[in-house]
């Protein structure tokens, strides 16, 4: 949510079509995550599947929503939405940065920072017991895939807008 607010603010301030494109994709990724949770909940239910683990949030999950109220969230755990969004934003941003003619040192530094931030967010979801490792990994993998897709479609879409 914070990423969406920052990108929205940047778009309002600059009217940059690339910011609007990223904002739209962040909303798409958020909605896809909610759709995937519904589909996976229908398939998994309360079952635990080898390697994939369980789809429900851990029993210890509390304070995982926007408001820390000490209650277990009612949303399904698979895939982790935080991991999904963090991986998407990190991968997409790294690909965009690497496509610009700036020094390799800056590209590498930004890639390290973005990757570390995404991994920190994913790690925090397991430390706070909001998700299992499998739920976080699935969110990260899906977010990364959508980041690559969004980057590869960027020039096609932006050319049609301009």
Regions found by a protein language model. Name each.
Residues 1-8:
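The first (N-terminal) embedded transmembrane alpha-helix
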Residues 30-51:
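Transmembrane alpha-helix/helix-exit interface in multi-pass inner-membrane proteins
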Residues 8, 40-45, 94-100:
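Short regulatory "switch" loops immediately downstream of catalytic or recognition motifs
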Residues 12-13, 28-35, 98, 122-123, ...:
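Hydrophobic membrane-targeting signal helices
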Residues 8-32, 136:
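Interfacial segments of alpha-helical transmembrane regions
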Residues 55-162:
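Membrane-embedded catalytic cores of phosphoryl/pyrophosphoryl-handling enzymes
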Residues 27-29, 33, 78, 131:
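Residue-level recognition of hydrophobic positions within alpha-helical transmembrane segments
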């Amino acid at each position: 949510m914070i990423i969406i607010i920052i990108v929205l603010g940047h778009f309002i301030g600059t009217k940059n079509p690339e910011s609007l494109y990223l904002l739209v994709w962040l909303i798409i990724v958020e909605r896809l995550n909610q759709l995937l949770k519904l589909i996976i909940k229908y398939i998994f239910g309360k079952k635990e599947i080898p390697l994939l683990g369980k789809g429900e949030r851990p029993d210890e999950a509390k304070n995982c929503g926007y408001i820390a109220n000490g209650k277990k969230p009612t949303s399904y755990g698979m895939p982790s939405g935080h991991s999904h969004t963090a991986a998407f934003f990190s991968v997409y941003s790294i690909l965009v940065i690497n496509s610009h003619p700036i020094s390799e040192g800056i590209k590498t530094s930004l890639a390290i920072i973005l990757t570390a931030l995404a991994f920190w967010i994913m790690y925090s979801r397991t430390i706070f017991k909001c998700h299992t490792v499998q739920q976080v990994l699935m969110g990260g993998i899906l977010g990364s895939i959508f980041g690559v897709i969004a980057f590869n479609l960027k020039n096609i879409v932006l050319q049609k807008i301009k």
